[in-house]
Structures are given as structure tokens and as C-alpha cells.
């Protein structure tokens, strides 16, 4: 399964991702309150007020880690956790921590998260093509040419191996022929020497 198809299978889980992102922002806000030593906060659709030794009110809060939590998101998520609508919500730090813990537990046991786990398992089990998708025509032609070249090279190497070596000519047969040639008859030679002249 290629990367684009894997990404496409995640589209069914966008609502889960948005819920996780919203909850993450509220968790970050709670951590920032603890870091600052704030005792409580007051949230409306347009403002976040942190109440502590140094109270502050702003349309958004930027944590020491650079995370930004806007009032509209925090107000909406906190309203969902509280379970009722109100112009503003006031919670202390302990109550906010309890609300966040309950939200995390509900998310872990949700059908949406189980469905996401099934999708991950299906993606992991899908075969992958390390070479990537084949380009029509071009890749096929290149592969055919490469196979033909490899075949020709193998044929040439096999022919070179099977061709019998040409025997070297040796001087030995000449010597044999010289030794085997008829020699003058020694007796005839001696007879000629003993024949009296006329």
C-alpha cells in the first residue's frame, strides 16, 4: 500500500484527531496553571483569566513551551467536559485535572480509538512495493532491455566456456616422421663399394 493510500485511510478518523488536539490544548493549559502556581481559571468564549499570585486575562495563552491555547477552543472543550452550556466556566486547578483525566480515560475506551487501531493494523499488514508504482511503458521497456542484455551476456559467457580449445601444434610429429622415413640400405651401400670397377 503506497503512502497516498495510507493517508487516505486516515480521513475517516479526522474527528478523533480533532478531539485529541482539543483535549491536548486543555491539558497544556492545566500544566501551565500548575507551572505558574495558579489556583483557578475563568473561561469565556473570548477570554481566559488565570487567577493566582499574578493573575492575567487574555484572548489566548502562550505557555513557556511555546504552545498557544485560545479562549474559544478552551471554552468549547471545557463546556463539553462540564456537560452544560454557560456564558463562562470557572474551575480550580484540581477540578480541571479531574476533568482532563476523565476525558483521557473516555477517549482510550472509545469506539473511535478502537476503529483507529483496526486501521493501523490493516495498514501494517498490507504488502508494500519497495520499487514503487510502475510507470506505464517506460519502466517496462527499461526492464525488458535490461533482461535482454543480461540474457545476451549469459549466452556469450556460456559459449566462451563451452568452446573447445584449439590444440597446439607440436614439433614432435615432425620428429616422428623423420625417424620413420626409410633410411638407405647399409648393405646395398657396402655392396656398391665392393663392386669391382669395369
Curated annotation (Swiss-Prot):
Chain ranges passing through the membrane: none
Domain of life (superkingdom): Bacteria
Disruption phenotype: Cells lacking this gene show a normal growth rate, do not exhibit a decrease in the efficiency of natural transformation, and is as resistant to ionizing radiation as wild-type. However, deletion of the ddrC gene decreases the ionizing radiation resistance of the recA mutant strain, and appears to increase that of the pprA mutant strain. Moreover, cells lacking both ddrC and ddrD exhibit a slight (two-fold) increase in sensitivity to ionizing radiation, but this phenotype is apparent only at the highest applied doses.
Keyword entries, A-Z: DNA damage, DNA repair, Stress response
Upregulating conditions: Induced to high levels following extreme ionizing radiation exposure. Also highly induced in response to desiccation stress.
Region (Disordered) location: 124-198
DNA repair in keyword set: yes
A GO BP annotation: cellular response to desiccation
Presence of keyword DNA damage: yes
Basic and acidic residues: bias regions: 136-180
Physiological role: Appears to contribute to D.radiodurans capacity to survive exposure to ionizing radiation. May play a role in DNA repair and genome reconstitution.
Name of the molecule in the record: DNA damage response protein D
Annotated organism of origin: Deinococcus radiodurans (strain ATCC 13939 / DSM 20539 / JCM 16871 / CCUG 27074 / LMG 4051 / NBRC 15346 / NCIMB 9279 / VKM B-1422 / R1)
The organism's taxonomic lineage, starting at the top: Bacteria, Thermotogati, Deinococcota, Deinococci, Deinococcales
